[in-house]
Amino acid sequence: MSTDKKKEEVPKPETEDLTVKDETKNKDKKKANEEEELSEEDQKLKGDLEMLVQTLLEDDSKLYETTLTQLKEFIKNSTSSMTAVPKPLKFLRPFYPDLCKAYDKWSDKDQKSSLADMLSVLAMTYSDTHQHDSLRFRLLSDTSNIASWGHEYVRHLALEIGEVYNEQVEKEAEDNSTSTESSPQPPHMNFEFSKDVILQLSLEIVPYFMKHNGEEDAVDLLLEIEAIEKLPQFVDENTYKRVCQYMIACVQLLPPPEDISFLQTAYSIYLSELQLPEALSLAIRLGNEDMIRSVFDATSDPIVHQQLAYILAAQRVPFEHPELQEIIGNTKLSEHFLYLAKELNLLTPKIPEDIYKSHLDSSKSVFSSAGLDSAQQNLAASFVNAFLNLGYCNDKMITDNDNWVYKTKGDGMTSAVASIGSIYQWNIDGLQQLDKYLYVDEPEVKAGGLLGIGIASAGVHHDVEPALLLLQEYINHSDTKISTAAILGIGIAFAGSKNDEVLGLLLPVVSNTENSLELAAIAALALSHVFVGTCNGDITTAVMDNFLERTPLELKSEWARFLALSLGLLYLGQGEHVDDVLETINAIEHPMTSAIEVLISSCAYTATGDVLLVQDLLHRLTPKAVKSSDEDEDEDNEELSQEDMNGISAFLGKKENEIAEEPQGNEGADNEMEVDSHQDETTTGENNVKKEENEEEKTEKSEKTENDEEEEDEEESKDEGANDELAYAVIGIALITMGEEIGKEMSLRHFGHLMHYGNEHIRRMVPLAMGLVSVADPQMKVFDTLTRFSHDPDLDVSMNSIFAMGLCGVGTNNARLAQLLRQLASYYSREQDALFITRLAQGLVHLGKGTMTMDIFNDAHVLNKVTLASLLTVLVGLISPSFILKHHQLFYMLNSGVRPKFIITLNEEGEQIKVNVRIGQAVETVGQAGKPKTITGWITQSTPVLLGHGERAELENDEYISYTNNIEGVVILKKNPNFQEEE
C-alpha cells in the first residue's frame, strides 16, 4: 500500500506547469502592454481616433470632410519625430481594411480623394509586400501637397514607384516574349499603373528631395524610372555639385547605356552652371568632339579658354582652335617642365650607376658577371639613362659621347641613338642633336636617329610638324630597319592626334599585304596609337584584310599579336560601337579569331567594371579537360588520362607526368633486349620482316607528308591562338576592373588564384596584369607579391614580374622598390635577359628622377587613352619576353604615355607664379553631409610641386581664385579682389 501511495503522490510532468505559467505570463504581459498603451494621453488619443473613424464608417456624408481634416491633423502633428511608428498610425492600423471598404462605397469625388490621401499614408504601416497601396491611393487622390506628410512618407512613395516601374518593365518583356495567353494576375495588379502618371508623380517628388538634402534619393528615383535626363531642370547652384559628384561616382556601377546617360546628364548640368572645366572632363571622357566644342562656345573669356586648352593638352586630345593651338599642341610643355626641374634643383644630370648603386652590392665578385654580354648591358644602361634623364635635355653619358653608341652592337645601336630623343623629349632642340645620325652609313644608327626624332616630338605639335617632314621620306625605304623605325617614330610622335596626314602616309603600308608582316603590323600599331579610341573604319578594314589574306604561317609570327592589338586600341573605351567588328571577326574561320575577340572586347569595355565580361574571361581561363595524344592506340589509357586531366592539379602536372613516363619506356626496352638475346633465330626472322614492312611504310609516308604537315600547322596555329586567348583574357580582367577600387581588389584576388592554378601562358601574364592594375601606385601588398613571383622557376614569369614591379613604381622613386630591384639585379647577375629587364624596371621607377608618371587616370577619373595604349603595346610584346628583348625598340612606345606629374601655377598673363598649396591624400566626399574636407594629412608647399598617385591639392588661402577646381597640371589663377591678409 505504501508503494501505491507513493506512486499516486508522484508529481505531474513539469511541462504542464510550464504551459500554465507561460499562459499566465502572457496574460500579465498583455495587461501590462494595455496599461502602457492606454496611458491617459494615449487613451484619449485612441478614443478620439476611434470616434472619428466610426464617423467615417457611418452613412452621414456631411461629417466626412471635417472628420478627415481632423484625422489628418492628428497624423501630421505626430510625424514630427520618426524614430518609431507614430501613435495615430499605430491606433488606426486595425481600421485600415474598413476604411478601404468605405472608400469603395463613397460616391463624392472630393471626399474620396481626401480619404485616398490619408489611406496612402496609413498604407505605409499596413501594406503587405508588393501591394503598393501607398502609391495606388496616392494616384487615386487629387491632392498635390505630398510634402505635408513628411520625408519618411515621400521616401516610401519613391521606393514603391521604383518597384512598380520595374514590375511593369518585366511584364512588358514577358508579354513580348510569351504568347498572348493571359496569366492570372495577383489582386494588387488589377489597378493599372500608367507610366506617364508615375513619371508625373516622380517629377513632383524630385523637387522635394532637392530642397531637403536628398539629392541622392532624387537621382536614384529618376534612375529607377529611366528618366535621368529630366534631372537638370530641378538642379540649382546650391545642389548641382552634390548631384553631379554622386552621378559620376555611380557611373562605375551602372550597366550601359545608363552609364553614358548619367555622364551626359552631369555634363549638361555642369554646362548650365558654367562649371566648364568639369564639363570638359566629362566631354573628354565621353569622347565627343561636339560636346568639347560646346564647352568652348559657352564662354568668350580667353583666360578660361586657355585653362580648358591646358586640360585638353594634358589628355592629348586634339582640338582645332586657332588662338589656342600652341597650348593644345603642348609646345610649352618642355619650358614648364624645365622650370619645375630648376625650382626643385634637379637639373644636374644623373647616370645609371646612381640608381644601380653597385658599390652597395656585397655579393658582387670578379666572376659574378662572367659570360654576360657587355653590349647588352650597355644597351640596358642606354635605356636607364633615357628614362632617368627623360625631358631634361642633358645627360653625362650619350649626348657628349658619340662613341657610346658603338659600345652596343646590331639593333642595340638603334635603341642607343633613340635614347637621345628621350633625353630631349618635348623639346624641338632634340631634332638638331639627332640630325647628324641621319647621315651615317650604318642602317641601325640611321634608324635610331629616326626613332629618336619621333620620341623627341612625342605629343608636341607645331604648325610645321618638323618630325613628320623628316620621317615621311623614310616610310617606304628599302631597308626594313629604317622604314620600321620611321613608322614607329611617327606613331610615338603623333599618338592620340588623329592626324589625317599620318593616315594617308601609313594606311597604304598596312593595306598592301605584299609587305612583310612586321612592316604591316608596325604601321597598323602606329596608326592605332594615332587614332586611339576613334573606331576608324579605314584602319579597321585594312587590318582585317591582313588577317584574311595572309597565310597561316605568317600569322604564326608574334607580329600578328600587334595587328590584333591595333584593332583593340582603335576601339579602346568604345563599348557601344564594337558589336559590328566583333560580328565580322566571328565570321572569319581562323584559330586566332577567339583571341582577337577577347582582346577587342576587353579594350572596348576598359574601366567599365563590367562584371559579366569579367566572368566570361574567368570562364575562358578555367582549365578544360585535355585529350590524350595516343587516343587511337589505346582507348583505356585515353579514358584514364582524360579523367586525370579533369582535375586542376593533373592539368598543371601534365608535363611532369610526360617526363616521368620516358625512363619507364627505356627500362622496358632494356628488358626486351635481354629476352631477345635468348631467341636469336626468331629475332633475325622478325627483323627481316620488319625491314620489308618499313620500306612499304616509307613509301606510304612520303605520300602523306604534305597532308600531315598541313594538319600539324593547323594544330599548332590553333594552340597558339588558344594560348594568346588566355594571355589576352588575363590582361582583359585588369583592363575592365581598373576603373574603381573594389574591382581592383577583387581582380588582385583572382590573379592570386590564376597564378596558383593557371598554366604557363596564364602565369606569364598575371604579374603584368597586376602591374597594369596598379600603375604608379606602389602598394606594399602588390609589389611584395610580385617580388615572390620574380623568383619563379619559369624565367619568363620572373622577368614579367620584375617589369611589373617597374610599372607599380613608375616615376615614384619608391625606396623599397628600388632596394628590391637592386637585390634582384644581384640575384640575376648571371642571367643577362633577366638582368636587362631588371635594369629597365629600375629606370622606370626613377623615371624623370621621380617627376614623371604613367598614371592612367587623373583626379577627375578621366582615362588617358594614349598612356594606356603605350602600356598595352609593351605588355602584349611581353607575352613572349624573348621577342620584345630582340625588338627592344618597342619599349620606347612607353615614352608616348609619359607626362609630368606637376602643379604649375600661372597668372592671367601666362607668367609662372609661386603660390602655397596644400597637398594630401584625396578623400571621397560623395554623399556626405555638409562641406567635408577633400584631403587629409596634407603638407603645405609652394608651387611648382609634384602630385603623386591618389593625392589632391587645394589652394592654402583665398588670395587667388583658380579657373579650375581640380588643381593639377597647369593651373591659371587670378587675384581675389576681396582678399584681406590676416594681421
Swiss-Prot record:
Skewed-composition ranges (Acidic residues): 630-642, 706-718
**Keywords, ordered alphabetically:** Proteasome, Repeat
Gene3D superfamilies linked to this entry: Leucine-rich Repeat Variant (1.25.10.10)
Q: Which gene encodes it?
A: RPN1
Task: Give the source lineage, highest ranks first.
Answer: Eukaryota, Fungi, Dikarya, Ascomycota, Saccharomycotina
Annotated Basic and acidic residues bias: 1-26, 688-705
Keyword Cell membrane found: no
Q: Which Pfam families match?
A: PC_rep, RPN1_C, RPN1_RPN2_N
GO MF entries:
enzyme regulator activity; protein-macromolecule adaptor activity
Gene Ontology CC: one annotated term: proteasome storage granule
PC repeat segments: 415-447, 448-484, 485-519, 520-557, 563-595, 768-799, 800-834
Q: Where is this region: Disordered?
A: 1-44, 169-188, 625-644, 662-724
Q: Which domain of life is it from?
A: Eukaryota
| GO process terms (BP) | proteasome-mediated ubiquitin-dependent protein catabolic process; regulation of protein catabolic process
Q: What does this protein do?
A: Acts as a regulatory subunit of the 26 proteasome which is involved in the ATP-dependent degradation of ubiquitinated proteins.
- What family does this belong to? Belongs to the proteasome subunit S2 family.
Protein name per its UniProtKB record: 26S proteasome regulatory subunit RPN1
State the organism of origin.
Answer: Candida glabrata (strain ATCC 2001 / BCRC 20586 / JCM 3761 / NBRC 0622 / NRRL Y-65 / CBS 138)
